[in-house]
């Protein structure tokens, strides 16, 4: 099983601002307030797409920002709500909060959705604040900021196809030319030290997941060269693509390579001996390869199909992809997977953290200022237009109603002391 993991940043859309406006119509004296509310900001929603296989798209774009709601308008017209930003993910994607490591969602079924970053509420227009004592309020609210957080996406995949063979036979090169994967390729053994995964599409649009596994060596079934770790990955694939360097350029005989790898597979797990296998004769662009291929076919017999290719000139690559897709189609109803011990009995559930809205804390800065923090007070701070004196007075009333003024006095706050909330500074006045 391979884990594809990527970290991304999400920013839900801010709510649109409410506006301060008045009804100005001929023959209608004292028309009253007419400021509309802002629209709701877009949420960031993850949705399962059964056709998606990897998290590759998220490696090219790491930051996602949803749209802001429209501002309110005069004549009590509300701003338009923004459309949610929907991000498609493969089945089996787990979404975690990077900061807390909390599981926010475990998405498994096609079409399943989870709202991970909630869009901000639209600010209220001045019409909303009209009362008998204040029939024409001259302030409005700013839109609520959308949620902002970093999340990690984890996807556990079973590869359909596993590339096996000795080091430097061309497995990584093959994966790089038939998929968008970018495995490390070098002119030395064991360039690949961990499995690489790629989604491959045959010319007829049949697709499958291919894994480039680190090169096996003799003794791998006994753990030599981290053999157990690599063979465990092979155990979970449906089809084995056995690549052989037909040129013998590494000083090994192709037929011996074939026998050794198959012996190691069978020694590790007897069932691997019967796993569907496609033999690929690589490096056919080299002059020695043709003669070696004739001898190789004579040795293994006609029952084992061999597909000659060159990953350098890309000869016969399409034929190989057709053969792999056909073999997968033939064994599509056979389950070769091995259950993970830790996965038994797991219930997949959707988690959603809902922070308390009314608690606050008061701390002291080094310069003696009082620092007030908390979800509710910070939300009100962000939604207050501090360029409007009436809005500032309303904010002060809200602080008193929440008990913040009394709590500051209990902490020793006196007339003229500095109080900080987020980026704002206020002078405490009795």
Curated annotation (Swiss-Prot):
Q: Which residues bind Mg(2+)?
A: 172, 192
- Enzyme Commission (EC) number: 3.6.5.-
User: Which residue intervals define the domain OBG-type G in the entry?
Assistant: 159-329
Sequence positions that bind GTP: 165-172, 190-194, 212-215, 282-285, 310-312
Cytoplasm in keyword set: yes
GO molecular function of the protein, one example? Answer: magnesium ion binding
| Pfam families membership | DUF1967 (PF09269), GTP1_OBG (PF01018), MMR_HSR1 (PF01926)
Q: Which cofactor does it need?
A: Mg(2+)
List the InterPro entries hit by this protein, alphabetically.
Answer: G_OBG, GTP-bd, GTP-bd_Obg/CgtA, GTP-bd_prot_GTP1/OBG_C_sf, GTP1-OBG_CS, GTP1_OBG_dom, GTP1_OBG_dom_sf, OBG_GTPase
Describe the task this protein carries out.
Answer: An essential GTPase which binds GTP, GDP and possibly (p)ppGpp with moderate affinity, with high nucleotide exchange rates and a fairly low GTP hydrolysis rate. Plays a role in control of the cell cycle, stress response, ribosome biogenesis and in those bacteria that undergo differentiation, in morphogenesis control.
> What family is this protein classified in?
Belongs to the TRAFAC class OBG-HflX-like GTPase superfamily. OBG GTPase family.
- Subunit: Monomer.
Protein name (Swiss-Prot/TrEMBL): GTPase Obg
Q: Which species does this protein come from?
A: Staphylococcus aureus (strain bovine RF122 / ET3-1)
């Amino acid at each position: 099983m391979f884990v594809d993991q990527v970290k991304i940043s999400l920013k839900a859309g801010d709510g649109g601002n409410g506006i301060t406006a008045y009804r100005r119509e001929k023959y209608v004296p004292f028309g009253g307030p007419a400021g509309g509310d802002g629209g709701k900001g877009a949420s960031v929603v993850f949705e399962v797409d059964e056709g998606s296989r990897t998290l590759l798209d998220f490696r090219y774009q790491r930051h996602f920002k949803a749209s802001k709601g429209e501002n309110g308008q005069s004549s009590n017209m509300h701003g338009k709500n923004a459309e949610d930003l929907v991000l498609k993910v493969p089945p089996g994607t787990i979404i975690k909060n990077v900061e807390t490591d909390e599981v926010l969602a475990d998405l498994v079924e096609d079409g399943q959705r989870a709202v991970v970053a909630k869009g901000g509420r639209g600010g209220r227009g001045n019409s909303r604040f009209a009362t008998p004592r204040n029939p024409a309020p001259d302030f409005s609210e700013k839109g609520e900021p959308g949620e902002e957080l970093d999340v990690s996406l984890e996807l556990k995949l079973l590869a359909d196809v596993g590339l096996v063979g000795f080091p430097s036979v061309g497995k990584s090169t093959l994966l790089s030319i038939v998929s968008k994967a970018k495995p490390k390729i070098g002119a030395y053994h064991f360039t690949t030290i961990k499995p690489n995964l790629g989604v491959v599409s045959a010319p007829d649009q049949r697709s499958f997941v291919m894994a480039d596994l680190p090169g096996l060596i003799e003794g791998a079934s006994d753990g030599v060269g981290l053999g157990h770790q690599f063979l465990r990955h092979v155990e979970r694939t449906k089809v084995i693509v056995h690549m052989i360097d037909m040129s013998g350029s590494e000083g090994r005989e192709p037929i011996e390579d074939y026998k050794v790898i198959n012996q190691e597979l069978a020694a590790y797990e007897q069932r691997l001996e019967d796993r569907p296998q496609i033999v690929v004769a690589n490096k056919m662009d080299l002059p020695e390869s043709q003669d070696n291929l004739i001898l190789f076919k004579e040795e293994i017999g006609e029952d084992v199909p061999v597909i000659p290719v060159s990953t350098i000139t890309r000869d016969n690559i399409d034929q190989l992809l057709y053969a792999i897709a056909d073999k997968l189609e033939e064994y599509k109803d056979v389950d070769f997977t091995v259950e993970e011990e830790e996965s038994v009995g797991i219930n997949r559930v959707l988690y959603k953290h809902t922070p308390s809205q009314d608690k606050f804390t008061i701390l002291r800065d080094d310069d003696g200022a009082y620092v007030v923090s908390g979800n509710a007070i910070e939300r009100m701070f962000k939604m207050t237009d501090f360029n409007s004196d009436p809005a500032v007075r309303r904010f002060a009333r809200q602080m008193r109603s929440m008990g913040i003024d009394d709590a500051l006095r209990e902490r020793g706050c006196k007339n003229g002391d500095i109080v900080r909330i987020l980026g704002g500074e206020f002078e405490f006045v009795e």
